[in-house]
């Protein structure tokens, strides 16, 4: 097989499919983030009652992103979506300091889930465009992220509204999609 035919085969190889679970409290910005990734209009977003799924092509991957509603009454159903998750993206509203404890508890519970064991996690410290937003470093410290040892993780400041930091986070996802620790 010549070099040209090898290159043709590589070029025509289908993108690796990746299942991404997008979670976080209600009003954290998950759906805005998903629409930003899909280059869709973000001017009119309503609370997600069930879930949204979008597929996005990125760096040789077909990212199937599952955006699950974050309202308290929906959270018990999150576990129905854990199976076969390749990457967990957890979105935090950096400007809503009153809910840091609640979001920290939810994240800790997710990290303890057996079906998500070893799954790489990206934490988006969202709404950095707001003056009241806590920096990602402060959130990481407050949530004791440095104690996470059973998986690769990253905290990324972003604004789903402006798009700032979103691509940096997704670059990390694509680099670490195969880093699931057994």
UniProtKB/Swiss-Prot annotation:
GO terms for biological process: cilium assembly; kidney development; mitotic cytokinesis; photoreceptor cell development; protein transport; small GTPase-mediated signal transduction. GTP binds at residues 24-31, 67-71, 126-129. It is a peripheral membrane protein. InterPro entries: ARL2/3 (IPR044612), P-loop_NTPase (IPR027417), Small_GTP-bd (IPR005225), Small_GTPase_ARF/SAR (IPR006689). GO terms for molecular function: GDP binding; GTP binding; GTPase activity; microtubule binding. A lipid is attached at residue 2 (N-myristoyl glycine). Transmembrane segments: none annotated. It comes from the Eukaryota. It is found in: Golgi apparatus membrane; Cytoplasm, Cytoskeleton, Spindle; Nucleus; Cytoplasm, Cytoskeleton, Microtubule organizing center, Centrosome. Keywords: Cell cycle, Cell division, Cell projection, Cytoplasm, Cytoskeleton, Golgi apparatus, GTP-binding, Lipoprotein, Membrane, Myristate, Nucleotide-binding, Nucleus, Protein transport, Transport. GO terms for cellular component: centrosome; cilium; cytoplasm; cytoplasmic microtubule; Golgi apparatus; Golgi membrane; microtubule cytoskeleton; midbody. Small GTP-binding protein which cycles between an inactive GDP-bound and an active GTP-bound form, and the rate of cycling is regulated by guanine nucleotide exchange factors (GEF) and GTPase-activating proteins (GAP). Required for normal cytokinesis and cilia signaling. Required for targeting proteins to the ciliary membrane by releasing myristoylated protein from unc119 cargo adapters into the cilium. Belongs to the small GTPase superfamily. Arf family. This is ADP-ribosylation factor-like protein 3. It comes from Xenopus laevis (African clawed frog).
């Amino acid at each position: 097989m010549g070099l040209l035919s090898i290159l043709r085969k590589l070029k025509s190889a289908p993108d690796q499919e990746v299942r991404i679970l997008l979670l976080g409290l209600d009003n954290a910005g998950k759906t805005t983030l998903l629409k930003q990734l899909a280059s869709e209009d973000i001017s009119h977003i309503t609370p997600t009652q069930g879930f949204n799924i979008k597929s996005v092509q990125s760096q040789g991957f077909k990212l199937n992103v599952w955006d699950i509603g974050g309202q308290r009454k929906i959270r018990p159903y999150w576990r129905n979506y854990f199976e076969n998750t390749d990457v967990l993206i957890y979105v935090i509203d950096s400007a809503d300091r009153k809910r840091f404890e609640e979001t920290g508890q939810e994240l800790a519970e997710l990290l303890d889930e057996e079906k998500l064991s070893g799954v790489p996690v990206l934490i988006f410290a969202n709404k950095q465009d707001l003056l009241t937003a806590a920096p990602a470093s402060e959130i990481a410290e407050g949530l004791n992220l440095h104690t996470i040892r059973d998986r690769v993780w990253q905290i990324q400041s972003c604004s789903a509204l402006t798009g700032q930091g979103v691509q940096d986070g997704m670059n990390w996802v694509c680099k670490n999609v195969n880093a699931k620790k057994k």
